[in-house]
């Protein structure tokens, strides 16, 4: 009896589908290229030179995912913007240290590769890279039968940027009297989604059908994370920025102290802005304590920037010119030993 000849495809891995995906995304990837990138897709490793304008360049790296926002996107069959979220979570972490993102790589894993879904996701990644001036230089598409439920996939991103050593922003310059400027968020960004999904479950609603402030709730919870790279890089050329905080997991209470030296505190004026409807809806439907809201969500604030009083008007003007919603949200005050470093009142 002759034995059946098995192939990789029989085992659930379709190499032709992977090749079709590469062809489908080539044009999107090409649009993200930078002059420092050497070669194109397909090499074993991606090559990138450091821009010549840097005298003492320091590389800054970051990696992230999008949490369970991905679960919501998959359940709602909305794959076009989750890639933007992936890039945003990485490049926003880099720019808070003054770094210009150089290149990005992604990891896409699934049980059975759906070329159209994967292409939609990677198109979003390319979009995010364009928004941040970052080259998409490669990635890994892993088709792994038996590892994921049908239709599911997972994402991770990795980014490298560069900053002049003398221009690193690390919070060490923060002083009592510094003013805090907020940059508005586009929504929950990519944090707090396990709680968002729980609220939706408890409320018993379909986010695609539920209307909130004239738009489907799905549009509001899946709004792509705002990318602040270009506006912040422009700002730090013209203002003496002492610290920048990216409000991600842990919200106000955990992220702001990461950029503060000892013996100072950030005093936030919560009357300086109004929460977007999606945050009010979440608090009401989930009966969520305000302290928990500030710990879980950005509540409408994507970034907080600390700078001297004399730079405030210049900073606000520049940020608004670059399309940001920016306002004074608080100030830096002296803190005694053991005192909380974030006060919201």
UniProtKB/Swiss-Prot annotation:
One of its GO terms (cellular component) is cytosol. Signal peptide: none annotated. Keywords: ATP-binding, Cytoplasm, Ligase, Nucleotide-binding, Purine biosynthesis. SUPFAM superfamilies: PurM C-terminal domain-like (SSF56042), PurM N-terminal domain-like (SSF55326). It catalyses: 2-formamido-N(1)-(5-O-phospho-beta-D-ribosyl)acetamidine + ATP = 5-amino-1-(5-phospho-beta-D-ribosyl)imidazole + ADP + phosphate + H(+). Disulfide bonds: none annotated. GO terms for biological process: 'de novo' IMP biosynthetic process; adenine biosynthetic process. It is found in: Cytoplasm. The keyword Membrane does not apply. InterPro entries: PurM-like_C_dom, PurM-like_C_sf, PurM-like_N, PurM-like_N_sf, PurM_cligase. Its main location: cytoplasm. It holds the Pfam family AIRS_C. One of its GO terms (molecular function) is ATP binding. Pathway: Purine metabolism; IMP biosynthesis via de novo pathway; 5-amino-1-(5-phospho-D-ribosyl)imidazole from N(2)-formyl-N(1)-(5-phospho-D-ribosyl)glycinamide: step 2/2. PANTHER family: TRIFUNCTIONAL PURINE BIOSYNTHETIC PROTEIN ADENOSINE-3, TRIFUNCTIONAL PURINE BIOSYNTHETIC PROTEIN ADENOSINE-3-RELATED. Belongs to the AIR synthase family. This is Phosphoribosylformylglycinamidine cyclo-ligase. The gene is purM.
């Amino acid at each position: 009896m002759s034995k059946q000849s098995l192939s990789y495809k029989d085992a659930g891995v379709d190499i032709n589908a992977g090749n079709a995906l590469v062809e489908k995304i080539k044009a999107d990837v090409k649009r993200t290229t930078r002059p420092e990138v050497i070669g194109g897709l397909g090499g074993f490793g991606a090559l990138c030179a450091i821009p010549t304008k840097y005298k003492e360049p320091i590389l800054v790296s970051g990696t992230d995912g999008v949490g369970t926002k991905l679960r919501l996107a998959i359940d709602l069959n909305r794959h076009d913007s989750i890639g933007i979220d992936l890039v945003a979570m990485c490049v926003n972490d880099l720019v808070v240290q003054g770094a210009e993102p150089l290149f990005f790589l992604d990891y896409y894993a699934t049980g059975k590769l759906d070329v159209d879904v994967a292409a939609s996701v990677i198109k979003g990644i390319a979009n995010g890279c364009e928004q941040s001036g970052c080259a998409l230089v490669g990635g890994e598409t892993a088709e792994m039968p038996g590892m994921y439920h049908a239709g599911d996939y997972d994402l991770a991103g990795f980014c490298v940027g560069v900053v002049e050593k003398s221009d690193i922003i690390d919070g060490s310059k923060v002083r009592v009297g510094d003013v805090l400027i907020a940059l508005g968020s586009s929504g929950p960004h990519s944090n707090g989604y396990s709680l968002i999904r729980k609220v939706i479950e408890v409320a018993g609603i379909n986010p695609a059908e539920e209307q909130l402030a004239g738009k489907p709730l799905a549009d509001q919870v899946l709004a792509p994370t705002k990318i602040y790279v270009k506006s912040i890089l422009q700002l730090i050329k013209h203002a003496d920025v002492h610290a920048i905080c990216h409000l991600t997991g842990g919200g106000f209470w955990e992220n702001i102290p990461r950029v503060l030296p000892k013996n100072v505190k950030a005093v936030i004026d919560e009357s300086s802005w109004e929460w977007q409807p999606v945050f009010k809806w979440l608090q009401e439907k989930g009966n969520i304590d305000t302290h928990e809201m500030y710990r879980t969500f950005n509540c409408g604030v994507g970034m907080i920037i600390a700078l001297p009083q004399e730079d405030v008007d210049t900073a606000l003007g520049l940020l608004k010119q670059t399309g940001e919603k920016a306002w004074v949200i608080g100030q830096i005050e002296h803190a005694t030993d053991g005192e909380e470093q974030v006060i919201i009142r």
